[in-house]
């Protein structure tokens, strides 16, 4: 169900829009994704697969639409943001807190993401297509912040799951 809702529906929407010639010449389509499509995040699981597929669909249709109608199709990789879909992510609140602390600019809010989408729909980005654009306060470019290094240095004891199995990483 996750793949259907978070990826295949995007493909179907673009496919129908193309058949019905529903997107204007020079138009713009934007879908939201998350860095877990390219990195490993505990608890993200199926949603990470769906977001990877979503980004691939955007690139594929971006080429077709770009050549045929000068339409731009991009994805925006947003900071962890409280959403209905996000409620299914294990420890979402901890992920949001961690990302906010790791990001030099902090997490981008839903309102800031909406502003970024408006820019992507404008003619200011008429040559931007088939891209996954990060809107995450710098989180996607971070390796390890000083704050995280200091915290980890205090306690690097093994982490055990509910069955007592040690989890590394």
Identify the meaning behind each predicted range:
Residues 8, 12, 75, 93-128, ...:
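C-terminal helical subdomain
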Residues 12-26, 64-68, 123:
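A short helix-coil junction within the Rossmann-fold of NAD(P)-dependent oxidoreductases
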Residues 1-9:
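Glycine-rich NAD(P)-binding loop of the Rossmann-fold in SDR/ketoreductase-type enzymes
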Residues 1, 23-67, 78-82, 106:
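Catalytic loop of short-chain dehydrogenase/reductase
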Residues 140:
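Residues immediately C-terminal
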Residues 20, 26, 146-169:
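Non-catalytic terminal and boundary segments that flank Rossmann-like NAD(P)-dependent oxidoreductase
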Residues 6, 27-34, 72-77, 129, ...:
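Structural signature of the Rossmann-like NAD(P)-dependent dehydrogenase/reductase core
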Residues 79-91, 143-144:
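Short beta-loop-alpha junction of Rossmann-like oxidoreductase domains
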């Amino acid at each position: 169900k996750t793949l259907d809702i978070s990826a295949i529906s995007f493909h179907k929407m673009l496919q129908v829009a193309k058949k019905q010639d529903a997107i204007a010449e020079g138009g713009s389509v934007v879908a939201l994704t998350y860095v877990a499509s390219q990195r490993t995040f505990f608890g993200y699981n199926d949603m990470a697969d769906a977001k990877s597929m979503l980004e691939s669909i955007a690139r594929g249709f971006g080429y077709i639409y770009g050549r045929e109608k000068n339409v731009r199709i991009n994805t925006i990789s947003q900071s962890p943001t409280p959403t209905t879909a996000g409620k299914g992510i294990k420890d979402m609140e901890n992920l949001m807190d961690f990302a906010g602390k790791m990001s030099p600019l902090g997490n981008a809010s839903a309102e800031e993401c909406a502003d970024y989408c408006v820019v992507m729909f404008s003619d200011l980005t008429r040559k931007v297509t088939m891209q996954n654009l990060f809107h995450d306060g710098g989180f996607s470019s971070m390796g390890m912040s000083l704050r995280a290094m200091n915290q980890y240095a205090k306690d690097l004891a093994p982490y055990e799951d509910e069955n007592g199995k040690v989890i590394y990483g």
